[in-house]
């Protein structure tokens, strides 16, 4: 299935000069959403993933159905103040400043094989911070899966030799 046909391109959003790739039109189309999920599920099986981790909010949309299909857990990564128990945190750079991601300090067991899922690989900042959170807890990132990769932003460079799967590239 050609998933690109289900992505809506929105020019000049959220600001002038930005081309936004809207994945909600993949989610609107049940067979496309299922196909995308199934592709990532097969990848997760090949890697022997034991838990899925996803940054808010679209990482939940991608990662939760994968975890469900595999009958494994899902661990959310969130902005500060959104998780109720003790957390660990990792800062990451933005174009103008920095942001922070958090994760429950007991979300990953030492040695656990982790698949990170998100909607988009752009600069790699969010996923790189997510990798650091997993590694702080002793987890082993066996792969990262994304619906879309924006090649011109070189996000893979920030991720070193991590195993990466993307379903659509622009």
Curated annotation (Swiss-Prot):
Question: Which Gene Ontology cellular component terms are annotated?
Answer: cytoplasm
Which superkingdom, per the lineage?
Bacteria
Q: What is its EC number?
A: 2.4.2.7
- Per its record, what are the GO molecular function terms? adenine binding; adenine phosphoribosyltransferase activity; AMP binding
InterPro entries per UniProt: Ade_phspho_trans, PRibTrfase_dom, PRTase-like, UPRTase/APRTase
Where does the UniProt entry say this protein principally localizes?
Answer: cytoplasm
Q: Which residues cross the membrane?
A: none
Show the catalytic activity: AMP + diphosphate = 5-phospho-alpha-D-ribose 1-diphosphate + adenine
Question: Zinc: is it a keyword of this entry?
Answer: no
Pathway in which the depicted protein is active: Purine metabolism; AMP biosynthesis via salvage pathway; AMP from adenine: step 1/1
Q: Which GO terms describe its biological process?
A: adenine salvage; AMP salvage; purine ribonucleoside salvage
- Tell me where it resides: Cytoplasm
Going by the UniProt record, its keywords in alphabetical order are:
Cytoplasm, Glycosyltransferase, Purine salvage, Transferase
Known role: Catalyzes a salvage reaction resulting in the formation of AMP, that is energically less costly than de novo synthesis.
Per UniProt, subunit arrangement is: Homodimer.
Q: Give the family from UniProt.
A: Belongs to the purine/pyrimidine phosphoribosyltransferase family.
Q: Which NCBIfam families match?
A: apt, PRK02304.1-2, PRK02304.1-3, PRK02304.1-5
Q: What is this protein called?
A: Adenine phosphoribosyltransferase
Q: What is the lineage of its organism?
A: Bacteria, Bacillati, Bacillota, Bacilli, Bacillales
């Amino acid at each position: 299935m050609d998933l690109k046909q289900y992505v809506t391109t929105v020019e000049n959003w959220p600001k002038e000069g930005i081309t936004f790739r809207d994945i909600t039109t993949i989610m609107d189309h049940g067979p496309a959403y299922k196909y995308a999920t199934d592709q990532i599920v097969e990848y997760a099986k090949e890697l022997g993933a034991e838990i899925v981790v996803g940054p808010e909010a679209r990482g939940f949309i991608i990662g939760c159905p994968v975890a469900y299909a595999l009958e494994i857990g899902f661990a959310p990564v969130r902005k500060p103040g959104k998780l109720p128990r003790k957390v660990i945190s990792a800062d990451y750079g933005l174009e103008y400043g920095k942001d922070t991601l958090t994760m429950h300090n007991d979300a990953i067991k030492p040695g656990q094989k982790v698949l990170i899922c998100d909607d988009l690989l752009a600069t790699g900042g969010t996923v790189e911070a997510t990798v650091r959170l997993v590694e702080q807890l002793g987890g082993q990132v066996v792969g990262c899966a994304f619906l879309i990769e924006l090649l011109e932003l070189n996000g893979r460079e920030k991720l070193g030799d991590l195993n990466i799967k993307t379903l659509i590239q622009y």
